[in-house]
């Protein structure tokens, strides 16, 4: 009897899938978008303000042989989030994966935090992500993937003057556990990644808030200090987070649900 040749299974492939990544114009979001495309997905590249960065990501994705479009929307505004999803499902005929990456950083001692700063941080990092998840549930194909963005500072890695940001991300950890229950009827999994310090194009701008006297250090000195926080003695980069996101987006992650995956090299 002749054997029937079957092609080998290639893990983490996303061929035929459509992904939406919020805050995908630069940094971790851009790396997510490109890596999802590298795995075969078509990608909606969301951005709030800078179309030039988003269009550069679209061009890079197209150079890989996949397809992408950029759509502007500020996810701190629920009406714009609703519009984003309505437009996104029209582009490639549906959505299979939603990655909520848009966020803002904040530093301030308890005595200095204003109502305006509180609202700014929570409107994007917490409220914004919640309503991205709501619209994802409404629009995702079944089975689907929702991947939210937390932080290692939301749990066991505390930083002075970082309470607003940390708490805004801590809420995401609770969302993930609860929303996984709500989304089960559509076979949609809900997880989050929790990066540590990650070297992006904005890394050195924010280092002064994380490290004492960073304004007096060279870039090399800052990188060495950050590398030593991890037992692996290296810095984290956007691609490190993007690879984990691609796993969570794939069929291989089907039995991972309601979890927050730390991606910080063991720093926390």
Curated annotation (Swiss-Prot):
Pfam families: adh_short_C2. Pathway: Secondary metabolite biosynthesis. The active site is at 150 (proton donor), 151 (proton donor), 165 (proton acceptor), 169 (lowers pka of active site tyr). InterPro entries: NAD(P)-bd_dom_sf, Sc_DH/Rdtase_CS, SDR_fam. NADP(+) binds at residues 28, 74, 101, 134, 165, 169, 200. CDD domains: THN_reductase-like_SDR_c. One of its GO terms (biological process) is secondary metabolite biosynthetic process. Transmembrane segments: none annotated. One of its GO terms (molecular function) is oxidoreductase activity. Its EC number is 1.1.1.-. Keywords: NADP, Oxidoreductase. The keyword NADP applies. PANTHER family: OXIDOREDUCTASE, SHORT-CHAIN DEHYDROGENASE/REDUCTASE FAMILY (AFU_ORTHOLOGUE AFUA_5G02870), SHORT-CHAIN DEHYDROGENASE_REDUCTASE FAMILY PROTEIN. Short chain dehydrogenase; part of the gene cluster that mediates the biosynthesis of agnestins, dihydroxy-xanthone metabolites. The pathway begins with the assembly and cyclization of atrochrysone thioester by the non-reducing polyketide synthase Agnpks1. The atrochrysone carboxyl ACP thioesterase AgnL7 then breaks the thioester bond and releases the atrochrysone carboxylic acid as the first enzyme-free intermediate. Belongs to the short-chain dehydrogenases/reductases (SDR) family. This is Short chain dehydrogenase AgnL6.
């Amino acid at each position: 009897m002749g054997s029937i040749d079957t092609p080998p299974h290639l893990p983490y492939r996303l061929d035929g899938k459509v992904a939406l990544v919020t805050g995908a114009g630069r940094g971790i979001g851009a790396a997510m978008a490109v890596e999802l495309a590298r795995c075969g997905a078509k990608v909606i590249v969301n951005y709030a303000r800078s179309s030039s960065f988003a269009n550069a990501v679209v061009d890079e994705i197209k150079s890989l042989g996949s397809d992408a479009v950029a759509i502007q929307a500020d996810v701190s505004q629920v009406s714009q989030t609703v519009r984003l999803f309505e437009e996104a499902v029209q582009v490639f005929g549906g959505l299979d994966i939603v990655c909520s990456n848009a966020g803002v950083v904040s530093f301030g001692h308890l005595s200095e935090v204003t109502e305006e700063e509180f609202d700014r941080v929570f409107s994007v990092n917490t409220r914004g992500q919640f309503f991205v998840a709501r619209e994802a549930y409404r629009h995702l194909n079944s089975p689907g993937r929702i991947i939210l963005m937390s932080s290692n500072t939301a749990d066991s890695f505390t930083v002075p003057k970082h309470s607003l940001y940390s708490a805004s991300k801590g809420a995401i950890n609770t969302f993930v556990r609860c929303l996984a229950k709500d989304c089960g009827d559509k076979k949609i999994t809900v997880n989050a990644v929790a990066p540590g310090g990650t070297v992006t194009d904005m890394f050195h701008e924010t280092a002064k808030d994380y490290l004492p006297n960073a304004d007096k250090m060279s870039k090399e000195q800052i990188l060495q200090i950050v590398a030593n926080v991890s037992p692996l003695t290296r810095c984290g980069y956007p691609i490190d987070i993007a690879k984990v996101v691609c796993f969570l987006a794939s069929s291989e992650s089907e039995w991972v649900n309601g979890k927050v995956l730390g991606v910080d090299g063991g720093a926390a």
